[in-house]
C-alpha cells in the first residue's frame, strides 16, 4: 500500500476516535479511548514507514562511497578535502597510518645500518651514502615516507615546521640545502650519513611511482658514483625492486621498500633489505566492508570493531578510526629477514575477517571500483587480488576498472552509468581530483 494512503487512513482513524471520546466529557485530559487510538496509530505509522519500500531508486549522490589508497587532499599542502570526505552520510576513506609506517621504515633502515656497519660502508670512506626513490611529490604517503627516512637518518632539514620532502637531484658533495649530513656513532666511531641523490620517479607520460624510471635512475647514479652508494631507500617496493633487480642485488647493496609486495618479500632471502607491510589484507577488507555496512543499514562498526553475526572482527592493534576525518587506517609492520616468511603470500585474506556473510541479511549488491593505475605493482598484484577474495565473502558483485595512472578521465569515462551500481570505491590518480568523481555522482 502507498505510504501516503496508509497515513491518510490512520489520520482518519485518529479523528474518529477523538470525536467519539469527546462526546460528553468536559475533562482537559484526552479520553482513554483517544489515547489508545493515538498510540496505536503512531505505532502503525512508524511500522509502515520502516517497512515500506523507498519511493524509487536511491539517488547516486546518496549511495555509499569509499575512497581508498589515495586520501582526498591538497597535493601541495596535504590538507584533507573534507568536502569529499563528507560527500554524503555514507562516505569514508580507507588507507593506512602513513606517519606511523614512514617512521617504521626509517627506523628499519637505521637499525639495519647499525647492525651491519662492518660491511655497509663499502668504500671505507666513513660516509654512509644512500639514494632515495620518491614516488610522487604531491602524495601524502610519499611525502611521509621521504620524511621518515630523513628523520631516522638525521638528514632532514625543517621547512615550515616539517622536514622538507623535496627531491634534491644529486648531492655527492653534501652541498644541497634541502637535506643535511647526518651523524651516527656506532661502536665508538662516528659516521656521516649523506643523501647522495633523490628524485621523483615520474615518466614522460606523467605517471608517478614509476618502476622503470627508478630502474633508469639507479643505472645513471651507479655509473656516476656507484662506489659511494651503500643503501637504497624507496617510497615503495615497485621502484625498490626495479632498482634491486637492475643493480643493487648484484652489488649486494641493501634496498628498502614499502608495501610488502610478494616479490619484494621473497627477495629478502636474496639480499633485499626489508619492506613495510601496510596490512593490505586489512585495508582491502575495510574498503569493501564500509560500503557493505552502509548498504545493509547497520552500524558502521559492524564486522570491524564489533563482531558481526559471522564472527568477523578486527582488533585495535591492526587498525584505527579517526571520526573527524571519517577515515579508517590500517597499522603497519616491518618485514625483515627475521619475519619475512610470514608475509610471502600477500594476497591471503586476514583470518579474523574471512568468514562468509549470510545473503539473507547481506544480499548481493553491485559495486563500481577503480584502480588508478592497472600497472601499479602493489595495487594490481596485492590489493586487487585481496579485494577479489573479499568481495565473495561480503556478497558484493564488483566491477573492477583499471586506469592508466595518468588522467582521471581515463577512469571517469567508464563511470557513465552510475545508476547501475549500489556503491562506489574510488582510487584517484591525483588526491586533488575528488570532484571529478563526485560531480558525476551528483548529476
PLM features per residue range, with description:
Residues 16-19:
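Bacterial Sec-type N-terminal signal peptides, specifically the leucine/valine-rich hydrophobic h-region
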Residues 1-10:
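Bacterial Sec-dependent N-terminal signal peptides
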Residues 22, 26-443:
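A residue-level marker of the well-folded mature domains of exported/periplasmic proteins
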Amino acid at each position: 500500500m502507498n505510504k501516503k494512503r496508509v497515513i491518510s487512513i490512520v489520520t482518519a482513524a485518529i479523528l474518529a476516535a477523538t470525536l467519539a471520546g469527546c462526546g460528553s466529557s468536559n475533562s482537559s485530559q484526552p479520553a482513554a479511548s483517544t489515547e489508545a487510538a493515538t498510540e496505536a496509530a503512531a505505532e502503525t505509522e512508524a511500522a509502515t514507514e520502516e517497512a515500506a519500500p523507498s519511493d524509487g531508486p536511491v539517488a547516486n549522490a546518496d549511495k555509499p562511497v569509499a575512497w581508498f589508497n589515495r586520501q582526498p587532499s591538497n597535493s601541495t599542502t596535504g590538507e584533507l578535502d573534507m568536502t569529499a570526505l563528507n560527500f554524503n552520510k555514507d562516505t569514508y576513506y580507507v588507507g593506512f597510518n602513513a606517519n606511523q609506517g614512514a617512521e617504521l621504515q626509517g627506523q628499519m633502515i637505521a637499525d639495519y645500518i647499525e647492525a651491519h656497519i662492518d660491511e655497509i660502508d663499502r668504500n671505507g670512506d666513513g660516509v654512509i651514502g644512500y639514494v632515495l626513490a620518491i614516488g610522487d611529490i604531491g602524495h601524502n604517503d610519499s611525502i611521509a615516507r621521504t620524511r621518515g627516512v630523513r628523520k631516522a637518518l638525521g638528514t632532514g632539514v625543517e621547512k615550515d615546521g616539517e622536514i622538507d620532502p623535496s627531491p634534491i637531484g644529486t648531492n655527492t658533495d653534501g652541498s644541497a640545502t634541502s637535506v643535511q649530513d647526518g651523524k651516527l656513532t656506532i661502536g665508538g666511531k662516528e659516521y656521516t650519513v649523506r643523501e647522495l641523490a633523490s628524485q621523483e620517479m615520474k615518466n614522460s607520460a606523467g605517471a608517478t611511482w614509476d618502476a622503470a624510471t627508478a630502474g633508469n635512475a639507479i643505472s645513471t647514479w651507479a655509473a656516476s658514483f656507484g662506489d659511494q652508494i651503500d643503501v637504497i631507500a624507496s617510497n615503495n617496493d615497485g621502484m625498490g625492486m626495479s632498482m634491486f633487480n637492475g643493480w643493487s642485488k648484484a652489488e649486494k647493496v641493501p634496498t628498502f621498500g614499502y608495501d610488502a609486495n610478494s616479490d619484494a618479500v621473497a627477495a629478502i632471502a636474496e639480499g633485499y633489505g626489508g619492506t613495510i607491510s601496510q596490512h593490505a589484507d586489512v585495508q582491502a577488507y575495510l574498503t569493501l566492508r564500509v560500503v557493505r555496512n552502509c548498504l545493509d543499514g547497520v552500524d558502521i562498526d559492524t564486522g570491524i570493531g564489533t563482531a558481526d553475526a559471522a564472527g568477523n572482527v578486527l582488533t585495535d592493534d591492526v587498525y584505527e578510526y579517526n571520526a573527524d576525518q571519517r577515515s579508517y587506517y590500517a597499522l603497519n609492520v616491518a618485514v625483515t629477514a627475521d619475519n619475512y616468511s610470514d608475509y610471502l603470500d600477500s594476497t591471503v585474506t586476514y583470518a579474523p575477517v574471512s568468514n562468509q556473510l549470510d545473503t539473507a541479511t547481506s544480499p548481493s549488491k553491485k559495486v563500481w571500483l577503480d584502480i588508478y593505475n592497472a600497472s601499479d605493482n602493489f595495487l594490481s598484484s596485492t590489493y586487487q587480488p585481496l579485494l577479489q577474495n573479499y568481495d565473495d565473502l561480503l556478497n558484493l558483485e564488483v566491477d573492477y576498472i583499471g586506469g592508466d595512472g595518468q588522467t582521471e578521465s581515463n577512469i571517469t569515462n567508464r563511470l557513465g552509468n552510475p545508476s547501475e551500481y549500489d556503491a562506489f570505491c574510488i582510487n584517484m590518480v591525483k588526491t586533488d581530483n575528488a570532484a571529478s568523481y563526485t560531480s558525476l555522482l551528483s548529476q
